[in-house]
Amino acid sequence: MALLLILVATAAFGGLDTVDKQVTPFKPGEEFSDGEYTVTIERARLVDELKGTHGSPKPGKLYLGVVTTLRNDGTVPGRLRDQLDLRDVPGKEFFGAFRFRDGSSIQTLGPGLTEQLVFAWQVPEAAAQSLQEVTIRVWKKKFTQLMVAYGGKEWIDTDNYGQIVVPVKGSA
């Protein structure tokens, strides 16, 4: 009961989250290291379909593709799904990560490898019409031991991130 009262009192005065987040701005074409990957975000574009993939045209939807070069600086394969955090785009749905060279789907990137990728989201056409630019966060990570005794190490997001604003080209 006492613990509950302490938590309620703490929440009333701003909660337990006192971590100061550190934001590192970067620009298109600049490298940003999140600890696991070195990321270079090149450009963003809206298209009706993703050629070479299973991204066929969908009524009322467009694809937002963000072209990125990624280098895995770690010693283990890294997952790609949550690598880019697309902000403030209503109704967005992550569609996948694809190799730029051939459109093949990619889920992980091995240690020491570099790949030019397209991260794609489906966005409602109504929201896409007003997209002049998009804000993307890349969360810094640390390689840490998991809490369970038999668990291995894992890349975990920290409270710090890099942030980039990328102009969006309309569909041609």
For the regions a language model picked out, list residue spans one by one:
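Membrane engagement elements in two modes
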Residues: M1-L50, P59, W155-A172
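Extracytoplasmic
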Residues: D34-E36, P59-G65, R81, S104, ...
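Short, surface-exposed ligand- or partner-binding patches at beta-edge/loop junctions that are enriched
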Residues: V123-Y150
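Short strand-coil-strand connectors
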Residues: S33-Y37, V89-G91, W139-K141
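The feature marks short-to-medium sequence segments in extracytoplasmic or secretory-pathway proteins
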Residues: V47, P57-K58, R71-L117, W121-Q122, ...
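Short N-terminal helix-initiation segments at or just after the protein's N-terminus
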Residues: A2-D17, K58-G65, L80-L84, K140-L146
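Short, well-ordered beta-strand segments enriched in hydrophobic/aromatic residues
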Residues: L64-N72
